[in-house]
């Protein structure tokens, strides 16, 4: 997916300004070049607080005012973890998946609203048995397999009856 970086500011002149405003995940921005439209979207939530003049500048979690937006269509794949004695294989059937935009969430149950977010193991600086990381591997048909930890040396493994939701842009 193509990546653009935006600096987003909002000016609110009211005396009853909010202390915080948020830019939701999947907020879309459209541009056009040579009469061709391109739609980009955020992949996470960003927030902004006002300065003394009521100007809000959205920032990333590391404080940068450059907000990344990605071109593409979000696709979601849901898996349910079987008995842990069974081999667990999670293949996302999408040959156009942008692996840099993957978000992996593991829910306790099929109806649970709380989840752990798993991150790519390549971003880990330290791995313990409780680390929530995944690995990604392209399989021969061009799809991608998501591989979780083993519960010891490569991090936490999802448990039986967990629900796994993987979304990414394509």
Q: What is each stretch, according to the model?
A:
Residues 1-170:
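Signature of Asx- and small-polar-rich beta-strand/turn repeats characteristic
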